[in-house]
């Protein structure tokens, strides 16, 4: 069985977010608490789960599977000098960067944004949100 390195698509996503030149911190490590976060704006990439799905292609060495990675982006913002809906502009900018074709996408053959949710403003002017993504890669042959 041959398989794809799961780190590769996560690193590609991290590179896309860094190339935006918007976030002061792009991390695949431990998610900081919004209240104690010292570097804003920041974004954290977390792999929630992965699924291998038969894509119907049969080869001489077995069936081919696509891998779908379910990823959460946690976004921390400071809206001190921004309007109340600034976080929606950030959300749209992140979504556009992810969906735009780029040479930085190497192993990811498709991607989509499933949705987002945001806090209710209890820590204003700081704002926290999450975006859920699906990254599709050519997975493995079994």
Where are these regions (language model features)?
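Low-complexity, acidic Ser/Thr/Pro/Gly-rich terminal tails and inter-domain linkers that flank the onset
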Residues: 39-49
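Charged, amphipathic alpha-helical segments and their flanking helix caps
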Residues: 1-35, 49-142
